[in-house]
Amino acid sequence: ANEQDSLTYAAAEKIYARGRMEEAKTSLNKYLQTFPEGAFSLNAHYYLCLIGNEQKNYDMILLHSGKLLEYPNNPFAEEALILRAEVQFNQQNMAEALASYKMLKEKATNVERRQLAETGILRCAFLLRDDIETIHAATDLLAEAKLSPELRNEALYYRAKAYTKQKADKKAMEDYRELAKDTRNSYGAEAKYQVAQSLYDAKEYAAAEKELLNYIEQSTPHAYWLARSFVLLSDVYHATGKDLDARQYLLSLQQNYQGNDDIESMIESRLSKLKVEN
């Protein structure tokens, strides 16, 4: 049986090596049916994972990666987890993807894979609205020595959002201030606005005005957050008794803003409020 086992497997592997995926799939499945506990069953499940990936057959990936993970310390576990977690994430099974990324983090044998796992954990936690998990995951990722600026921004942004929801406003502000240093990306564009909003909420109107005027001068390709900043600046002027300035900023924004979103209604409600009060 042992010789038969290895011969049957070797034949299937040869077909896979030639790139004949459909044929290899049939042969590998046949091998697993004939030798369910065969000496090469892990290899067969691994190749079937790869074929599933090649053919975008996601059920196949989940099935065979699941079989591989029944043997926790097998040499294919890391790659199986990478494929498995990606499928679960794309199918929006966030809790399952989170579990897979956590396993991957424990098993990761190099920095790239550890970072991939930490990024996955962060995104799943954020989408699951699990603030504590998000904060931990972002902090782990931010501790990585070689982190791309894009991932660093993403981690800071998710952590700031989670801190805000947990009422840790001071910590959220630290992350937003860090992000606000570069308003060219969407995270920084929103962060600069959030910093000013927080100053406004604290009734620090002079500081809020300074932050907003600085933002308007700096500008950003993200028109929505710049428009929100104009609206907030009008709120600052209204709060400090400069209704004429408030009205002017709103009218100028109304004429120049093209976006089809909630900005228009923000302008309208403020203009009618100014009309009633004056």
Where would I find each of the regions flagged by the language model?
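Acidic, polar-rich low-complexity tracts and alpha-helical solenoid repeat scaffolds
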Residues: 1-278
